[in-house]
């Protein structure tokens, strides 16, 4: 098994091949998405809402992230593991940002992701200097949704578009190996992709990026609420309910466990 590395990601980028990233938060899902052939597995702080039942990503702690990164790492995937740095884990100081990034790597992450542009460039640079690859995240940055006026499309105005491009260039200069663009106007994401020299991984930001990412629970129809840009490929939630209903019916009728299911 040849492990996917940053060299492989950059090779795909330079060859014009689309890069695929999907979230996973535990051992079995990491095994499955890796078998599907994704390039990167993102252990995202989105786990707070889709797995832990938190109202937002802001409640996710380093303890939560370390637990789930370690679970994914135990699956020993070929895909590169990217661990999210949760809210409050990198904003205070460069030293704290590096310390928490190191903890995620010790848990099994092979790169870390953090939200923000120019204002976090110093933290990005410090983490990169510590030898840890960093993925940036611009556009709809859920950890900062209150400051941005909620969950809304970014890049609709000329000023926002200019700021996003400036932020992307600042992140590139700080040393990121890629940048997630979330819920950004497609034309703006296209311009950013054309003007930076690192891959852009988009979610709800159009088809002109270097790659795409989706939350596994959105792909499978497991999330109670999915954003408008998330395509559902299978209604797994409905299938699970039907399967458990069938089990319950068979238990109550005495049909289960039938012959062959006991000794």
From Swiss-Prot:
Top EC category: transferase
Look up the record and report any one GO term of the cellular component aspect: cytoplasm
**A molecular function (GO) term:** magnesium ion binding
Cofactor names from the entry are: Mg(2+)
Catalytic positions are 182
EC number(s): the record gives 2.1.2.11
Which keywords annotate this record?
A: Coenzyme A biosynthesis, Cytoplasm, Magnesium, Metal-binding, Transferase
User: Where does the UniProt annotation locate this protein?
Assistant: Cytoplasm
One GO BP: coenzyme A biosynthetic process
How is the cofactor bound, in the record's words? Binds 1 Mg(2+) ion per subunit.
What InterPro entries does the record point to?
Pantoate_hydroxy_MeTrfase, Pyrv/PenolPyrv_kinase-like_dom, Pyrv_kinase-like_dom_sf
Write out the catalysed reaction: 3-methyl-2-oxobutanoate + (6R)-5,10-methylene-5,6,7,8-tetrahydrofolate + H2O = 2-dehydropantoate + (6S)-5,6,7,8-tetrahydrofolate
Which superkingdom heads the taxonomic lineage of this protein's source?
Archaea
Report residues binding Mg(2+). 45, 84, 115
Pathway, per Swiss-Prot/TrEMBL?
Answer: Cofactor biosynthesis; coenzyme A biosynthesis
UniProt binding sites for 3-methyl-2-oxobutanoate: 45-46, 84, 113
Query: Which family is this sequence assigned to?
Result: Belongs to the PanB family.
Subunit details: Homodecamer; pentamer of dimers.
Functional summary from the UniProt entry:
Catalyzes the reversible reaction in which hydroxymethyl group from 5,10-methylenetetrahydrofolate is transferred onto alpha-ketoisovalerate to form ketopantoate.
- Report the protein name in the record: 3-methyl-2-oxobutanoate hydroxymethyltransferase
């Amino acid at each position: 098994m040849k492990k996917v590395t940053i060299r492989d990601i950059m090779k795909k980028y330079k060859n014009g091949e689309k890069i695929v990233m999907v979230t996973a938060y535990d051992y079995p899902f990491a095994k499955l998405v890796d078998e599907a052939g994704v390039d990167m597995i993102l252990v995202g702080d989105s786990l707070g809402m889709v797995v832990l039942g938190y109202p937002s990503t802001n409640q996710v702690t380093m303890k939560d992230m370390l637990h789930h990164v370690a679970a994914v790492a135990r699956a020993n995937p070929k895909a590169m593991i990217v661990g999210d740095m949760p809210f409050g884990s990198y904003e205070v100081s460069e030293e704290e940002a590096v310390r928490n990034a190191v903890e995620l790597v010790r848990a099994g992450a092979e790169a870390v992701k953090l939200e923000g542009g120019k204002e976090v460039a110093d933290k990005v640079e410090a983490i990169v200097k510590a030898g840890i690859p960093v993925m940036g995240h611009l556009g709809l940055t859920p950890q900062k949704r209150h400051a941005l006026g909620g969950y809304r499309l970014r890049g609709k105005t000329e000023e926002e578009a200019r700021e996003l491009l400036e932020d992307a260039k600042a992140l590139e200069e700080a040393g990121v190996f890629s940048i997630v663009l979330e819920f950004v106007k497609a034309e703006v994401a296209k311009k950013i992709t054309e003007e930076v020299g690192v891959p852009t991984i988009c979610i709800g930001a159009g088809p002109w990026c270097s790659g795409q990412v989706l939350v596994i629970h959105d792909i499978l129809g497991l999330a109670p609420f999915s954003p408008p840009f998330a395509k559902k490929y299978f209604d797994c939630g409905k299938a699970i309910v039907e399967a458990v209903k069938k089990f319950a019916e068979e238990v109550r009728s005495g049909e289960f466990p039938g012959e062959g299911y006991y000794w």
